[in-house]
């Protein structure tokens, strides 16, 4: 058989072994001190279900997925691939968290959508529906663009923290009042790359 010219995994392992390097090629991320709340498999299944629901609700129509930076990026990417519709992306950015994990209570718009969404079906994609302050604010911002419809898709819902009365239209998981990270969610910009959603113990939540 002719060679493809591509060095596959077995070739890479052989080279590493020859060098005396026995380190695994893809070492698993260590959740040191963290409690896994939802595994990557549980997340994938639920996101697929959400995508199917959105596809049914907007069958035959176009949608614009508007993600909230930075936390919703991973969720939006996975959700989009589970939606069998003509979909485009855009992004918003806000500032609402202060130092560490403390929320300031004031929401500021750092970035609006780049393209016109007037007359479009918007799905506002967020990582977590928490106090409701950010999503209530962004709902007003997007409503001012005069869309055809506006729905909210949040991977997580933490109703115990709600300050502003608002509910999501598509919710992945309802969680207890614990600080969670992973799958895009962070603590002081850390842990976003964890594939699972994990709980940080209160003792670790010091202001940095």
Where are these regions (language model features)?
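PRPP-associated nucleotide enzymes
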Residues: 1-208
